[in-house]
Design a protein with these regions (language model features):
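Non-globular, low-confidence helical/coil segments that flank catalytic cores
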Residues: 1-166
Length: 166
């Protein structure tokens, strides 16, 4: 229904895919996944839009709900490389690629997850994996709204502000 309402209102609605890019204020954004056409274009979690932002002193990648297989495929066709911030895939489920996160080598890993969810997210294995690659886990269930910004001192350092502290 939303799609129909948007198009009726004159909005152009299309599926995002690798190669789409633009700017938003001082940020450059690039769609890394899914790949248009071919076998890499999928639906559901494996087809989650993955977007990279770069600007204002921070490089980040948002992984949607990509599971391990899709993360490996993304790495093969459009490796993001090192980033400052990663929005951890699929609420921190166990379906993650340790090698992919090691290659990201993010300073901060944002985990969007509901408190007391029945899925056990984020999983202990995901949290251990982030710890092992030096990524600070910042969780919405425990810390609430979180903001990451370049530190005033510069030098690539980041400042993390959380609604609930911790």
């Amino acid at each position: 229904r939303l799609h129909a309402r948007l198009t009726e209102g004159g909005a152009e609605v299309r599926q995002a895919a690798k190669g789409d890019a633009g700017t938003l204020g001082g940020l450059r954004w690039d769609i890394l996944w899914p790949v248009p056409g071919g076998s890499e274009m999928q639906t559901g979690n494996p087809g989650s839009v993955t977007i990279e932002f770069d600007g204002r002193g921070i490089r980040s990648v948002f992984l949607g709900d990509l599971g391990e297989d899709a993360q490996v495929a993304l790495d093969r066709v459009s490796a993001p490389g090192r980033v400052d911030v990663v929005k951890v895939a699929h609420h921190g489920s166990r379906d993650q690629s340790p090698q992919f996160y090691a290659e990201l080598h993010a300073t901060v890993g944002l985990i969007s997850v509901g408190a007391d969810n029945g899925y056990g997210h984020p999983t202990a294995s995901l949290l251990d994996m982030l710890r092992s690659v030096g990524t600070l886990a910042v969780r919405t269930d425990r810390q609430g709204l979180s903001v990451v910004a370049p530190a005033a001192a510069g030098g690539g350092a980041l400042t993390v502000w959380t609604e609930k502290g911790g």
